[in-house]
Each structure stands twice: as C-alpha cells, then as structure tokens.
C-alpha cells in the first residue's frame, strides 16, 4: 500500500499509463489508487490520474483519519484490506472498503474515488482553464 501522497499519486499514474497501453485511440485512461498519508494526520486518501496519451489530469478525493489501531497495523506492514476485514469480522475490502467501515457506510469505497476522478478529468472537460 502506498504510504504517502506522492506514492499514491504515482500508483494512480501507473495504473492510468497501463490502461492507456491497452486502449486504441481515441481514449481516456483513468487510474485510481488509495493510500495512506501521515501529514499532518494519519489518513486514508484516494488519488486519480487521467490521460489521453498527451495530457494528464490529477485529482484527490476526501480523506479520513484512520483509528490509531488500524494505522499502527498498516504502518507495521499489514495490508489495509486484511486489517479492515478483521475489524469488520468478514471480507469487506472489495465492497464497503475502509471508507464504508469507518463511516458506517455513509461513504463507501466507490464514493471515495468519485471526487478524485471528477477532479482528474477537469483538464479534459474544462480545457480552456487548463491550457
């Protein structure tokens, strides 16, 4: 799991680049990545990267502070998915995700990436301002 904003953004960029390599033009490839950031607080964050092969757009979603016990486990080397599955008592990593667990499903895993994706696409749907 990425352990900083820079690592999380790089993961999103790598996923978008990989998607772009499999697409036929014209395309718009998007990569999503979740990770941890410890500045100024230990938070779960989401980044999105988008490319059309020439231009790039980036966006970050909301953040949520991780409970100390979960943050400690992840910083100690455990996968966040394993930790949240254990905390929930069953597998939720691919459905509710950490966001769903932490917010009692007010915000879900999918929701966490919506703002990031919309922000990453801004240079494509609003090109006049992003010249």
Please report, for each region that a protein language model flagged, where it lies by residue.
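Anionic-ligand binding patches
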Residues: 2-131
């Amino acid at each position: 799991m990425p352990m900083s904003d820079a690592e999380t953004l790089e993961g999103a960029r790598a996923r978008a680049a990989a998607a772009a390599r499999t697409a036929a033009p014209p395309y718009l490839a998007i990569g999503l990545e979740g990770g941890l950031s410890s500045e100024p607080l230990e938070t779960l964050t989401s980044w999105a990267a988008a490319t059309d092969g020439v231009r790039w757009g980036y966006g970050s979603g909301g953040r949520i502070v991780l409970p100390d016990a979960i943050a400690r486990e992840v910083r100690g080397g455990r996968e966040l998915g394993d930790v949240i599955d254990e905390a929930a008592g069953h597998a939720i990593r691919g459905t509710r995700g950490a966001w769903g667990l932490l917010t009692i499903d007010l915000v879900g895993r999918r929701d966490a990436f919506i703002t990031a994706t919309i922000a990453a696409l801004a240079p494509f749907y609003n090109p006049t301002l992003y010249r």
